């Protein structure tokens, strides 16, 4: 347990930052889940909207140093690949 006042304050600050970081990370994951749900439903407009929001939130997490930039790049790349695959499947069905 911290004895110095500055150490006690830092415990409070760290708890607050941890909650904020968790919230930001959770928000990004929720948009990824919404994207996947839209993919399963076949709703392209909703997919595009959630892809943009997920990408934006992942980049924001990188800027705040919550997740590593390579992790965000990998997740965005995989989402983009799923979006592209969905588009190609829709074009094949239309043809």
UniProtKB/Swiss-Prot annotation:
Q: What does this protein do?
A: Binds directly to 16S ribosomal RNA.
Q: Name one GO molecular function term.
A: structural constituent of ribosome
Protein known as? Small ribosomal subunit protein bS20
Keyword list (alphabetical) reads: Ribonucleoprotein, Ribosomal protein, RNA-binding, rRNA-binding
Sorted alphabetically, the Gene Ontology BP terms of this entry are:
translation
What GO terms fall under cellular component here?
small ribosomal subunit
Supply the source organism for this entry. Answer: Ehrlichia ruminantium (strain Gardel)
Q: Does the keyword Ribosomal protein apply?
A: yes
Its taxonomic path starts at: Bacteria, Pseudomonadati, Pseudomonadota, Alphaproteobacteria, Rickettsiales
């Amino acid at each position: 347990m911290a004895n110095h006042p500055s150490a006690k304050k830092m415990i409070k600050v760290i708890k607050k930052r941890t909650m904020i970081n968790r919230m930001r990370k959770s928000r990004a994951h929720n948009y990824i889940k919404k994207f996947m749900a839209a993919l399963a439903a076949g709703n392209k407009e909703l997919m595009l909207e959630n892809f943009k929001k997920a990408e934006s939130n992942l980049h924001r997490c990188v800027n705040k140093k919550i997740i590593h930039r390579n992790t965000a790049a990998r997740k965005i790349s995989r989402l983009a690949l799923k979006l592209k695959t969905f588009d190609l499947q829709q074009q094949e069905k239309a043809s």
